[in-house]
From Swiss-Prot:
Key words of the record: Cytoplasm, Gluconeogenesis, Glycolysis, Isomerase
Any GO molecular function: triose-phosphate isomerase activity
Name this protein carries in UniProt: Triosephosphate isomerase
Natural source organism: Shewanella amazonensis (strain ATCC BAA-1098 / SB2B)
Cellular localization per UniProt: Cytoplasm
Self-association state and partner proteins as the record states: Homodimer.
Length: 260
């Protein structure tokens, strides 16, 4: 069985501040005791430099603990007249290691199709970033028992453009749309069922990728439900929204992941 290092990725969305970053790093130095889990901070773009400086300044205090930086989005284009966009190379230059692609809010609010998501996935890897690919079904799709169908479609578009082996350098995040920002989380059994399906889907083409790819759960993860979610055999941590804005809650989630 593969040894997949758990990950806790905090997606601040359009929230947070430089002060929150400072508060988190003060607690990281005390609370993070080992490298058994990887912690990723995905602040708004304007705060990437603040987080980068804090990573550098606290390198010794972190004592080998794996704290990384990620972005919430990138353009599928390398450069050009795309006002307000940011390229993969720019994110790489800023110190990012990861970037979220295909988040449900971007798909829903900004019309990002699966084809665009596949292009962004490719752009991330082209510039040395590891994409965190989000997939998930809506409430009506779940009620219609179309969960696997929807997720297979979202995965297959990315696979068709990039190949299965591209997932050797990628993270997948299952985020049921009916749980994102609603306070209603999938049960551990529901999460495990979907994560196992994703792993099987990839294993059909590459058993190595299926066994080794990390799959996070995202959707109203809190300190009260994280232990049961993270204990599932195919759940490798969480993509955290609201709880990532509370330093105490976020550190608790990191500790749970480290002991999962």
């Amino acid at each position: 069985m593969a040894l997949r290092r758990p990950m806790v990725a905090g997606n601040w969305k359009m929230n947070g501040s430089a002060a929150l970053a400072q508060e988190l790093f003060k607690k990281f130095a005390v609370k993070l005791q080992n490298d058994s889990a990887e912690v990723v901070l995905c602040p708004p773009t304007i705060y990437l430099e603040s987080v980068r400086q804090l990573l550098e300044a606290n390198k010794e205090a972190l004592n080998g603990c794996l704290v990384r930086m990620g972005a919430q989005n990138l353009s599928q284009h390398d450069f050009g007249a795309y006002t307000g966009e940011i390229s993969g190379q720019m994110l790489k230059d800023s110190g990012c290691r990861y970037v979220i692609v295909g988040h449900s809010e971007r798909r829903r609010m900004y019309g990002e199709t699966s084809d665009i998501v596949a292009e962004k996935f490719a752009a991330a890897q082209k510039h040395g970033l590891t994409p965190i690919l989000c997939v998930g079904e809506s409430g009506p799709a779940r009620e219609a028992r179309r969960t696997f169908e929807v997720i297979a479609e979202e995965l297959d578009v990315v696979i068709e453009k990039n190949g299965t082996m591209a997932f050797d350098n990628a993270i997948i995040a299952y985020e049921p749309l009916w749980a994102v920002g609603t306070g209603k989380s999938a049960t551990p059994e529901q999460a495990q069922e979907v994560h196992a399906f994703i792993r099987r889907r990839l294993s059909e083409v590459s058993p190595f990728i299926g066994e080794n790819v990390r799959i996070l759960y995202g959707g109203s993860v809190t300190p009260s439900n994280a232990a049961d979610l993270f204990a599932q055999p195919d759940v490798d941590g969480g993509l955290i929204g609201g709880a990532s804005l509370n330093s105490t809650e976020f550190l608790t989630l990191c500790s749970i992941a480290m002991s999962a």
